[in-house]
Amino acid sequence: MTTPHKKVSPKAPVLAADACPRCGTTMKEAHGVLRLPVNGEDVAVPHAAHLRCPKCKEVVLRLEDARRLGEDAIAIYRKKHGLLSAGDIRAIRERFELTQGDLAKLLHLGQNTVSRWESGRNVQTAAMDVLLRLLRDVPGSLEYLRSHAA
């Protein structure tokens, strides 16, 4: 008994790692302002590292540059709107010797949400920001939240 062979379709040409996906020209390292939406708002990130095609002007981000761009955009958004920074949130949690899971339970959130806030990958809502500030600034608020935790 013979095994049927799969038909192999012709492969698309493979581009070099630094080739523009649009026109194939070698991309060049660049730094400049890139814009990224955060909570529906367009945030300008200065000095963002990226690759730019000198021919067609296509912009491509390396994975690490894309992560950094997202984190920088969120930090700029937080600062513009007066929200606590990722470090501020971590400091509040550590001040009360809470794990991310403990804080998430107190705030009726998933543990991953707190992790994303602290790593700068997501931004907290204004309401959660106020709740975190109350926890930090108002004596007795931790006990109140514990008595009402899920």
Predicted feature locations:
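N-terminal flexible/basic segments that precede or flank functional cores
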Residues: 2-6, 11-83, 137-150
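Extended interfacial segments that mediate partner engagement and assembly in macromolecular machines
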Residues: 61-127
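Intrinsically disordered/low-complexity terminal segments and short unstructured peptides
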Residues: 1-2, 112
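Amphipathic alpha-helical "recognition" segments
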Residues: 116-137, 142-145
